[in-house]
């Protein structure tokens, strides 16, 4: 009688336990908040479906209870405790399963809601961002007059204030993104995404700030021009009244007095002409920033004043003025012709050099590396040709000025022919550059096209092999699947190589197009992985069908041999390659071995059913499976390490090529200007040189970072490869040292030219600066080198080494005064917008005096005695560098606080006081005294040599310079 209830009870218990086990396994699979939003939503839907299955589980538990009641009613008393115990186990398992279902679903749902709220806030921010981009996108509209320009400036300031107000929302968004990233780990909210959002905001803010600065400068120029016009009109009115007083019948003055009066008036004409020329020069800039109607009004006003001045000039020796003007015009034209011929000759030399170096067409059978080298060469030539565009404009302008001069036909033809040659070279370079880039794009697209063909073939194989009728079909399609897997591995290698060329793709095709290509590659890799895994599963299924017709030994021995072969091949790949192609080939081989390891794992699992019932065979299968898994883990480590090595070597090679190209262009430019001093007469040439020289400090930092990266690459290369990298770095440093030597020579030439201009213009008036001591320096507006104030011989003020101690004391006093001002600005509390503006103005004043201080310090270096050990000067150099670093950091940090608030540092500390302290914040607070103690120890280290009398401060100053560089460095840490 009890046999049937017992079987029902056992069956219901097994059904319930199996159902709960399946549910718990599904929950464990979905119990994860990491990953993209689509995956999170999928897990949320899965957990929701699982929660909806609670009623089904309840039914199964009820069946167990009913079966238990029936069994308890018919069983013996000795069996009841066991049945009741099993019932309690079932109930506890059911409660645990229900609790797990609820908690898992709630946790995933909370993270999803948090993410949704963040996306809403992000969308709101980007709507504002797009609105602001649209508002700032149109160019600045030209205005009619000064009042309209001031209104336009006010509107731009309102936009800038709106941008500043959005900083709070951005900070909140970044904080929420960081919190969300710690839970989901999705790249859309990682640190790079936060940096991109911050960078976009900074770009809009910079654009708004540039617009405000531009409009402020435009309004200021127009206002200054209007004041000068009013002053000139008052002078012109006074001169007209004097002239009219000397003319006509009503004039009672004698003839001698009239002539004397007219001669006195004529002496004022040069000053009036100079003032009018200055007004016309100012008007050029003002007209460029004024609407056509306003520009017409300004031009008419200038023409009217010019007409009045010319009428007055007619009264004084017309013929003599005409002859003198003719002679002066002829002399100016001859000088301009000489300058034009000199610049034309230099331009021809530059074109010949560029034509010989960078206009060879690309060979169609060139390799990818050769195409990249050609593209870089064409890019360098393109940049060099673009840098010659201002020179072409100058040649055309000078030729237009000399078009009325006789005997200029040959020079004019030469200029026109040279410009036509330049345009032809520019067009040819553009065609070659575009053709090379198009060829590279086709080369990089080939793996994607091949993958599309392979995907169709793989999908067709999967469809055909879904159900095979006999062993002959399996033997037919299994080699095809293996061939498809081999082709898949080859495609994966090619796509992996594309993913390692991020910097190269960005430099060739632009960041946006390169990002699109890399996204396509990433998507294609995912599709390939899915199909590859499907093919592996299908291959395993077919192999398992074949294995069923074999015994264990026949199936196991090939797997063991394949495992030993993989171990030997992996051991052979643990060496360090020589160069970048070797590392790339090693990476491809390791990825192929990784695919073979995965295939081996599937084959082992296919053999496992043959070992059932034999413990010895099962032990062999377990052992080879463990060995395969260990092998796969070591392969993953090797692949990750090799990918990192390839990525670092690619970055090193790319940056090395860019630096070498820039150094070559800069060296050629400096050598061309150093060889022909006549080009220094053109102010635009000197301005271009100053721009080039200003880029050298930034490139010096890049050279240092490249050396550090090169050391890292050398450690991860073979001895021969390390020698090659070291040789490349040595050549780079040689070319860099040669460039620095050229820079020093060029700076010396520029100073000499400035001194020559100053000596020629001895009539210029010297003015005192308002920010140095009374016994300080006298600054000439046209002379960047400061001089001491003396009343007798000027040479006594700047050429005698005996005055060096006095100059040193004066500079120390000036630097101490500037430091005091900076400290007062830092400690200033901002209560209103006016206070904020005052503080910004004071900081700008300090920054504006930095070039002046640099000139003073260079003067100290120039006048330093030859045998002076310069310990005091080295200490002063360190204090000067430290002041500049502190001023730069203060300009970035202090201006971030809004009116009515403390500074950015004080505000952050006050906010942290009320925020919940996490474990990381507590650790930082505990470590803060230790950090301060470490900084004090570092300060003591480079101050200790100052106490030794016999040693110089060179070591301490070198350390101080490196410490100041660390203070100013804002980029990522060097690798």
Curated annotation (Swiss-Prot):
Residues 917-975 form the KASH domain. Ubiquitous. Keywords: Disulfide bond, Endoplasmic reticulum, Membrane, Nucleus, Repeat, Transmembrane, Transmembrane helix. GO terms for cellular component: meiotic nuclear membrane microtubule tethering complex; nuclear envelope; nuclear outer membrane; rough endoplasmic reticulum. PROSITE patterns: KASH. The chain crosses the membrane at residues 926-946. Residues 947-975 are perinuclear space. SMART domains: KASH, SPEC. It is a single-pass type IV membrane protein. The keyword Transferase does not apply. It is found in: Nucleus outer membrane; Nucleus envelope; Rough endoplasmic reticulum. The disulfid bond with SUN1 or SUN2 is required for stability of the respective LINC complex under tensile forces. Signal peptide: none annotated. Its main location: nucleus. As a component of the LINC (LInker of Nucleoskeleton and Cytoskeleton) complex involved in the connection between the nuclear lamina and the cytoskeleton. The nucleocytoplasmic interactions established by the LINC complex play an important role in the transmission of mechanical forces across the nuclear envelope and in nuclear movement and positioning. Probable anchoring protein which tethers the nucleus to the cytoskeleton by binding PLEC which can associate with the intermediate filament system. This is Nesprin-3. It comes from Mus musculus. The gene is Syne3.
């Amino acid at each position: 009688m009890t046999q049937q209830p017992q079987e029902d009870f056992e069956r219901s218990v097994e059904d319930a336990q199996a159902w709960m086990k399946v549910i718990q396994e599904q929950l464990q699979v979905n119990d994860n908040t990491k990953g993209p939003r689509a995956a999170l939503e999928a897990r949320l839907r899965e957990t929701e479906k699982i929660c909806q299955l609670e009623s089904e589980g309840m039914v199964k538990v009820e069946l167990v209870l009913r079966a238990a009641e029936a069994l308890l009613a018919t069983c013996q008393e000795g069996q009841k405790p066991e049945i009741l115990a099993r019932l309690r186990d079932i109930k506890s398992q059911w409660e645990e399963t229900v609790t797990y279902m609820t908690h898992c679903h709630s946790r995933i749902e909370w993270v999803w809601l948090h993410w949704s709220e963040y996306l809403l806030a992000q969308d709101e921010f980007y709507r504002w961002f797009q609105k602001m981009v649209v508002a700032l996108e149109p160019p600045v509209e030209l205005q009619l007059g000064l009042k309209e320009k001031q209104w336009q400036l006010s509107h731009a300031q309102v936009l800038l204030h709106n941008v500043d107000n959005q900083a709070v929302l951005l900070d909140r968004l970044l904080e929420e993104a960081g919190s969300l990233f710690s839970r989901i780990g999705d790249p859309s909210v990682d640190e790079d995404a936060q940096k991109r959002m911050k960078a976009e905001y900074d770009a809009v803010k910079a654009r708004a700030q540039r617009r405000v600065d531009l409009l402020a400068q435009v309004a200021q120029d127009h206002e200054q021009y209007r004041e000068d016009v009013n002053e000139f009109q008052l002078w012109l009115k006074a001169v007209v009244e004097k002239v009219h007083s000397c003319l006509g019948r009503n004039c009672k003055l004698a003839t001698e007095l009239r002539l004397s009066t007219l001669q006195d008036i004529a002496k004022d004409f040069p000053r009036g002409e100079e003032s009018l020329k200055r007004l016309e020069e100012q008007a050029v800039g003002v007209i460029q920033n004024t609407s056509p109607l306003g520009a017409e009004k300004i031009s008419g006003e200038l023409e009217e004043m010019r007409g009045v001045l010319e009428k007055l000039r007619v009264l004084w020796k017309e013929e003599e003025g005409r002859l003198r003007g003719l002679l002066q015009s002829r002399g100016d034209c001859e000088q301009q012709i000489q300058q034009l011929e000199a610049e034309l000759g230099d331009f021809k030399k530059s074109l010949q050099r560029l034509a010989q170096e960078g206009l060879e067409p690309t060979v169609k059978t060139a390799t990818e590396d050769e195409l990249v080298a050609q593209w870089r060469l064409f890019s360098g030539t393109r940049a060099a040709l673009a840098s010659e565009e201002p020179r072409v404009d100058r040649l055309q302008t000078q030729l237009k000025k000399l078009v009325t001069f006789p005997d200029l036909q040959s020079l004019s033809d030469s200029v026109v022919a040279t410009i036509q040659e330049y345009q032809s070279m520019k067009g040819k370079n553009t065609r070659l550059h575009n053709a090379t880039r198009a060829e590279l794009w086709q080369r990089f697209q080939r793996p994607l096209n091949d993958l599309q063909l392979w995907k169709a073939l793989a999908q067709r194989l999967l469809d055909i092999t879904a159900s095979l009728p006999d062993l002959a079909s399996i033997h037919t399609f299994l080699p095809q699947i293996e061939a498809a897997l081999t082709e898949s591995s080859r495609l994966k290698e090619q796509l992996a190589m594309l993913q390692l060329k991020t910097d190269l793709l960005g430099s060739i095709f632009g960041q946006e197009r390169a990002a699109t290509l890399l996204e396509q590659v990433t998507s294609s890799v995912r599709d390939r992985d899915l199909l590859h895994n499907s093919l592996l599963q299908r291959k395993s299924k077919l192999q398992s069908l074949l294995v069923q017709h074999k015994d264990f030994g026949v199936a196991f021995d090939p797997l063991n041999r394949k495992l030993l072969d993989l171990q030997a091949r992996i051991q052979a790949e643990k060496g360090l390659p020589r160069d970048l192609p070797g590392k790339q080939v090693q990476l491809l081989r390791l990825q192929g071995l990784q695919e073979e390891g995965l295939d081996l794992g599937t084959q082992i699992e296919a053999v496992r059913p043959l070992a059932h019932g034999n413990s010895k065979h099962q032990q062999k299968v377990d052992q080879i499976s463990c060995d395969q898994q260990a092998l796969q883990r070591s392969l993953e480590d090797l692949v990750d390490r090799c990918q990192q090595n390839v990525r670092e070597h690619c970055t090193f090679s790319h940056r090395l090529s860019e630096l070498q190209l820039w150094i070559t262009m800069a060296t050629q430019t400096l050598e061309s200007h150093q060889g022909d001093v006549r080009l220094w007469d053109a102010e635009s040439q000197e301005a271009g040189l100053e721009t080039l020289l200003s880029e050298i400090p930034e490139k010096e930092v890049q050279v240092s970072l490249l050396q550090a990266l090169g050391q890292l690459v050398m450690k991860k290369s073979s001895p021969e490869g390390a020698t090659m990298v070291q040789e490349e770095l040595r050549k780079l440093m040689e070319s860099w040292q040669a460039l620095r030597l050229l820079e020093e020579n060029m700076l010396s030439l520029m100073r000499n030219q400035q001194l020559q201009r100053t000596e020629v213009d001895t009539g210029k008036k010297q003015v005192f600066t308002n920010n140095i001591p009374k016994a300080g320096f006298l600054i000439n507006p046209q002379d960047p080198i400061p001089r001491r104030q003396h009343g007798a011989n000027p040479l006594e003020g700047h050429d005698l080494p005996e005055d060096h101690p006095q100059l040193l004391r004066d500079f120390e006093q000036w630097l101490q005064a500037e430091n005091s001002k900076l400290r007062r600005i830092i400690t200033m509390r901002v209560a209103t917008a006016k206070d904020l503006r005052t503080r910004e103005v004071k900081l700008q004043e300090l920054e504006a005096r930095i070039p002046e201080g640099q000139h003073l310090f260079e003067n100290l270096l120039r006048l330093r005695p030859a045998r002076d050990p310069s310990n005091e000067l080295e200490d002063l150099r360190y204090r000067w560098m430290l002041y500049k670093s502190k001023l730069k950091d203060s300009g970035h940090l202090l201006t971030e606080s809004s009116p009515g608030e403390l500074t950015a540092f004080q505000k952050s500390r006050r906010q942290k006081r009320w925020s919940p302290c996490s474990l990381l914040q507590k650790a930082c607070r505990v470590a803060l005294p230790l950090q301060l103690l470490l900084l004090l120890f570092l300060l003591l280290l480079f101050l200790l040599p100052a106490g030794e009398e016999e040693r110089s401060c060179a070591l301490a100053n070198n350390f101080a310079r490196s410490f100041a560089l660390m203070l100013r460095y804002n980029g990522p840490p060097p690798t």
